[in-house]
């Protein structure tokens, strides 16, 4: 299946949001995931299966001052 992640169209295996984050080395990081214009709560990352054509934005929080 193909999904667009942060503006880049990628071919992905069947997976959940949690699987995608793990594959990208983002597990445990402070971040927000938007799927097709809707925020995916962290509690739903493991239950949210990606579908062909999904558009995701993954934003990682960066501390500093």
Language model segments and positions:
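Ubiquitin-like/PB1-type beta-grasp interaction modules and other compact soluble beta-rich domains
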Residues: 1-64
């Amino acid at each position: 299946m193909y999904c667009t992640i942060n503006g880049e169209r990628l071919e992905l295996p069947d997976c959940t949001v949690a699987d995608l984050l793990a594959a990208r080395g983002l597990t445990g990081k402070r971040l927000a995931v938007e799927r097709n214009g809707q925020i995916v709560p962290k509690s739903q990352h493991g239950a949210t299966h990606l579908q062909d054509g999904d558009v995701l934005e993954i934003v990682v929080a960066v501390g500093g001052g």
